[in-house]
Structure formats: structure tokens, C-alpha cells
């Protein structure tokens, strides 16, 4: 499944262009602009499955760093600071990774 099966290419482009500069990534505005905030729990789970590159059931820090590349191969990697802030926001149980329930809560935040 491709991410464009769930989200529109136009919304993805708008979301990516809003965070092209280093240190400009904001997960709340990204999820809103990309259209994920308005998707069903099932659709959000499918996006989680795409982001969970190693299929471990979690999005780990290295996968988060490449988060934007899941939306477009030409997108930039997140900076270390952006990655750590994103992980801290999503990792509510403190295990160092984001599970599917944590991701759903993060999207709806």
C-alpha cells in the first residue's frame, strides 16, 4: 500500500513544503495539513504500518528521522533535534519508540 492510497498527493506536497527548512517541522501542523488528522482510526493504522519500516510494531528513532521520506523520496530527513522532540511527544510510555496507539493519539493531538 502506498501512502497516496490514503492521503492526497496535493496535501502531501503542501505539508512537505511547509517544513522544508531545517528545524521547521511541527508534527501537529504536518498531520493537519497532510490530512491525517481527519482520517479514520483504521486509515491512521495503515499509515503507521507504512512508517514502521522494519515491521516491528513500533516507529523507532531512526524511522522517525526519515519520517518525511515516507511521503516523498525527495523530502529531507528530520534533524536530530526535530527527531528527539517528535519522539518525546509521541512516546507516552517512555520505552523509546512509538507504538500504534501512541501514534494515533499523536495524530489526533
From Swiss-Prot:
SMART domains given in the database record: EFh
Record-given protein name: Parvalbumin beta
InterPro entries: EF-hand-dom_pair, EF_Hand_1_Ca_BS, EF_hand_dom, Parvalbumin
UniProt-annotated stretches for the region In silico-predicted IgE-binding epitope: 59-66, 76-81, 79-85
Gene this protein is translated from: LOC109314825
Tissues with expression: Expressed in muscle (at protein level).
UniProt temperature dependence: Thermostable between pH 4.0-9.5. Average melting temperature (Tm) across all pH values is 74 degrees Celsius.
Function: In muscle, parvalbumin is thought to be involved in relaxation after contraction. It binds two calcium ions.
Keyword Repeat found: yes
Family per similarity comment: Belongs to the parvalbumin family.
Amino acid at each position: 500500500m502506498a501512502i497516496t492510497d490514503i492521503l492526497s498527493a496535493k496535501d502531501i506536497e503542501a505539508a512537505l513544503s511547509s517544513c522544508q527548512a531545517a528545524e521547521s517541522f511541527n508534527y501537529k501542523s504536518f498531520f493537519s495539513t497532510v490530512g491525517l488528522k481527519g482520517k479514520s482510526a483504521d486509515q491512521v493504522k495503515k499509515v503507521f504500518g507504512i512508517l514502521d519500516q522494519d515491521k516491528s510494531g513500533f516507529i523507532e528513532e531512526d524511522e522517525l528521522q526519515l519520517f518525511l521520506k515516507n511521503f516523498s523520496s525527495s523530502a529531507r530527513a528530520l534533524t536530530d533535534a526535530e527527531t528527539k522532540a517528535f519522539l518525546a511527544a509521541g512516546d507516552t510510555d517512555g520505552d523509546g519508540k512509538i507504538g500504534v496507539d501512541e501514534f494515533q493519539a499523536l495524530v489526533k493531538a
